[in-house]
């Protein structure tokens, strides 16, 4: 939609600190230039099974901000307050691009590393958001890649719910 915003000014409601990730001679900080936070209002039935704080589970209006950053962490925050909804998930790779949530409502996140790290070659992570466990990884050794060993995932995944297809260009 459209709105007349000529008299309105944006003000920061809160901010969240991130760390840094060193890999070789490089240090990554902040969030990537294509990185956008994901936001989700989880159904109460789903939140009951998630590893969220009790306050987050009890908040019927909670919109969770999920933000993969260049320090190797995925952060989980309350959109209204900026408070943590759960502990950060450390994956050890820099994330420059936005992740994606499964459009069918499954608590699954797809996020790809934007650069290699001391942990190994960049790859895509499929994350179970009930307990923040890694369900699957792929893309780190793509024999069909035209870019050789450059398996960086700076974009965002697309999930076609109708055909149960994941598209994640690297």
Where would I find each of the regions flagged by the language model?
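Noncatalytic, solvent-exposed loop/strand surfaces
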Residues: 1-170
């Amino acid at each position: 939609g459209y709105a007349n915003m000529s008299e309105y000014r944006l003000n920061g409601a809160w901010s969240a600190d991130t760390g840094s990730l060193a890999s070789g001679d490089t240090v990554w900080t902040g969030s990537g230039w294509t990185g956008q936070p994901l936001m989700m209002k989880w159904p109460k039935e789903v939140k009951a099974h998630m590893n969220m704080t009790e306050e987050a589970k009890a908040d019927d209006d909670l919109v969770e901000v999920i933000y993969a950053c260049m320090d190797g962490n995925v952060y989980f925050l309350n959109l209204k307050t900026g408070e943590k909804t759960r502990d950060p998930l450390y994956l050890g790779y820099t994330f420059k691009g936005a992740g994606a949530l499964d459009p069918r409502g499954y608590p699954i996140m797809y996020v790809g590393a934007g650069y290699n790290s001391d942990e190994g070659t960049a790859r895509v992570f499929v994350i179970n958001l009930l307990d923040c466990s890694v369900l699957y990884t792929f893309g780190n050794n793509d024999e069909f890649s035209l870019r050789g060993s450059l398996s960086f995932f700076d974009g965002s995944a697309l999930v076609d719910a109708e055909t149960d297809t994941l598209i994640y260009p690297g």
